[in-house]
Amino acid sequence: MTQVHRSAVIDKSVQLDEGVMIGPNCVIDSGVSIGSGTVVDANVVVGKNVKIGRDNRLFSSCTLGGRPQILALSHDAEFGGLVIGDRNVIREQVTIHPSTHPEKVTEIGNDNLLMIGVHIGHDCLLQDKIVMSNYVQISGHCRIETGVWLSGMVLLHQFVTIGKWCYAAGLAGINHDIPPFLIVSGHYPPKVRGVNKRGLARAGLSEAQQNNIAEAYEKLYRRGGALLENAKGLAQQDGLDENVLAMIDAIIKSSEHRFGRYLEKFRDD
């Protein structure tokens, strides 16, 4: 049974599936849809054209789909949407902005945990099973791949890609792409410290797959020489598995931009 508190303000166009619960003083704008089993606590604000999937938990005072923080965006400008998948936990005071382009969306996948005060900027992509600790701040146009874990107050520059199953220690200020499966720590810029073994275990990789990643890391980061040249040399070897190839691909792609952010190639300003 769908339950809506009488103090909630909900546009008549909003679509609520069976079992949705809307708490006191929520404001939900036009064009929003919310999937079954999703619980929306008190004082949550959901902006226009936000699509929310099943079994999510939205804690009090989070704001989803509010106007992007762009100086060049005129007062009457049209902006895009926000799509949130299933089984996400979005804690208090989280803010997630929609795309700045009317035909595009900011996208959040499934099974993610965004802790208190996390900010996700416009045009970002978060995949699945991501954990962001308190006050992580993600600038616009970033890509966060599956299984990434960002500790408290990590900051990402615009257009940064964080590869799958990476871990970033608290207070890291990340201004360039990070290949998959790695640990980074340090303030600005952080440094690669090793392989995220705990992440590999959570990913369900076999012992052989984990060993392949560890061996690739040694060849890429611990045997001297330039990282890009090491990656190109490793790419010449036969029989590399898909995980090692993903590491190599990320390194080569990020080298295509002078600051190490592959997605900068696609910016339209």
Regions found by a protein language model. Name each.
Residues 1-7, 12-13, 18, 55, ...:
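Terminal amphipathic alpha-helical/low-complexity segments used for targeting or macromolecular assembly
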Residues 3-190:
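Structural signal for interior beta-strand "rungs" in well-ordered beta-sheet cores
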